[in-house]
């Protein structure tokens, strides 16, 4: 029920052990159930939420409002975070999340820095996406995979159609292009812009990782953690920190929609 069903996800037994392992080390565990559900699936999703609640998962990251309603009825003290898949991209959306009892809002990765500054004034913790792939469409709203491959991106089964080769044609004649990857966006990297996000009041950062290798995750998280520690000491970000994000396979970097 997560937006990354093809990742090497936890089973129930592994989840229980992971929660114990993390809590012994002072680390919180957030579980994603952040796809949309039809009527036949909602009870199964709720069962997963019950299991997470009973085994002390700290919060659920969710998208489906029907699931939110059911959890609020049955487990009112279970913390919920609004997933980036909810595509919260305006202040009204943040205020709705507050009224629904969310404890944190992960705003859309298409957000600008101006919006982030306003979002962080709304008296609810804001999480922003800072590193990883960006969508050629609107993340959480793309139907290209469903239309061409019968695989729903909003069910976590995106076929990555935007990453394929395409030709550009005009009047039935192919137009020369610098690349055949005409729809494939660059990867986002906001390492050098962390000071602006901290100043805005962002409470936590989101780094893509569940479909990546442990090597990629370790390098990327290490780079951003070292950057935060340097900023806390009023030190500039060293080339060594920047180079950490180039050790793993990635596309060319961009600041995405932030600036």
Regions found by a protein language model. Name each.
Residues 1-5, 14-35, 39-53, 62, ...:
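Surface-exposed amphipathic alpha-helical tracts and adjacent flexible/coil segments at the periphery
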Residues 91-92:
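Conserved nucleotide-cofactor-binding alpha/beta core module
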Residues 66-67:
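Alpha-helix capping/helix-boundary segments
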Residues 87:
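Beta/alpha (TIM)-barrel catalytic core signal, keyed to glycine-rich beta->alpha loops juxtaposed to Asp/Glu
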């Amino acid at each position: 029920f997560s937006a990354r069903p093809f990742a090497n996800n936890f089973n129930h037994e592994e989840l229980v052990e992971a929660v114990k392992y993390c809590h012994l080390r002072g680390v919180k565990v957030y579980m994603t159930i952040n796809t949309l559900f039809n009527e036949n699936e909602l009870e199964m999703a709720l069962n997963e939420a019950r299991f997470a609640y009973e085994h002390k998962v700290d919060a659920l990251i969710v998208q489906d409002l029907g699931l939110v309603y059911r959890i609020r009825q049955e487990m009112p003290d279970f913390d919920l975070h609004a997933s980036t898949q909810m595509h919260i991209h305006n202040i009204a959306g943040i205020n709705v999340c507050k009224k629904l009892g969310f404890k944190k809002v992960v705003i859309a990765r298409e957000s600008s820095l101006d919006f982030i500054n306003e979002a962080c004034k709304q008296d609810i913790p804001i999480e922003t996406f800072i590193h990883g792939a960006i969508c050629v469409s609107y993340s959480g709203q793309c139907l290209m995979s469903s239309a061409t491959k019968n695989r729903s991106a909003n069910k976590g089964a995106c076929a990555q159609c935007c990453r394929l080769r395409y030709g550009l044609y005009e009047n039935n004649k192919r137009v020369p292009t610098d690349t055949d990857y005409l729809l494939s966006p660059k990867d986002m990297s906001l390492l050098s812009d962390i000071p602006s996000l901290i100043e805005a009041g962002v409470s936590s950062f989101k780094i893509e990782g569940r479909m990546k290798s442990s090597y990629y995750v370790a390098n990327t998280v290490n780079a951003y953690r070292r950057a935060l520690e340097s900023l806390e000491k009023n030190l500039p970000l060293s080339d060594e920190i920047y180079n950490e994000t180039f050790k793993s396979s990635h596309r060319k970097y961009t600041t995405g929609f932030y600036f």
